[in-house]
Amino acid sequence: MKVTKAELDCVAVKPEQYPNSPLPEVALAGRSNVGKSSFINKMINRKKLARTSQRPGKTQTLNFYNINDILHFVDVPGYGFAKVSKKDREAWGRMIETYLQQRGQLKAVLQIIDIRHDPTKDDQLMYDWLKHFEIPVIIIATKCDKIPKGKWPKHVKNIASVLEKDGGDPIVIFSSETGVGKDEAWKAILHAIS
């Protein structure tokens, strides 16, 4: 998909701050520092619309990005980051849970997982939670540029096995560096919102 418009529409922590818009939404979930912001930037061909950071826990709000006036990407705070207070982690958890459970415009969650490693316990909990609430999931196996192409199938199989992946949930191999998987990711996203 050719992106001609991409802008941060809204930053929210409470439902009353969500954008008053009928646009379908696709949320990005993943552990802290897995590359959610880099994914957004690569998908829209922009270097810095979504702020990236070497410091885990940078995203602390729900960030709604309007893409071509046809959908919102919703960047949510990363999970599994230990260096914030328990109180902050609980507040983030409630904020994310409220959004994922109550937002009618939400059509799918892109669960970003580092292809180099087996999914973490937090990845597994998030996937199970999304499946419990019957939220469609597109798994983005990112950072594929960091391992030889010949090893991709083995790593994808590991991800599917550890998550006990539902047959209907696609896994897209992706790289924010090279753009591998970008077209496949757009195809899966557009299918989810149609």
Swiss-Prot record:
Any one annotated GO CC term: cytosol
One Pfam short name: MMR_HSR1
UniProt cofactor(s): Mg(2+)
Alphabetical keyword list: Cell cycle, Cell division, GTP-binding, Magnesium, Metal-binding, Nucleotide-binding, Septation
Record-annotated EngB-type G domain positions: 22-194
Annotated positions binding Mg(2+): 37, 59
Binding-site residues for GTP, renumbered to this chain: 30-37, 57-61, 75-78, 142-145, 174-176
MF GO annotations: GTP binding; metal ion binding
CDD domains reported in the protein's UniProt record: YihA_EngB (cd01876)
GO annotation, biological process: division septum assembly
PROSITE patterns registered for this protein in UniProt: G_ENGB
PANTHER family cross-referenced by the UniProt entry: ENGB-TYPE G DOMAIN-CONTAINING PROTEIN, MSS1/TRME-RELATED GTP-BINDING PROTEIN
Free-text function comment from the UniProt entry: Necessary for normal cell division and for the maintenance of normal septation.
Sequence similarity: Belongs to the TRAFAC class TrmE-Era-EngA-EngB-Septin-like GTPase superfamily. EngB GTPase family.
Protein known as: Probable GTP-binding protein EngB
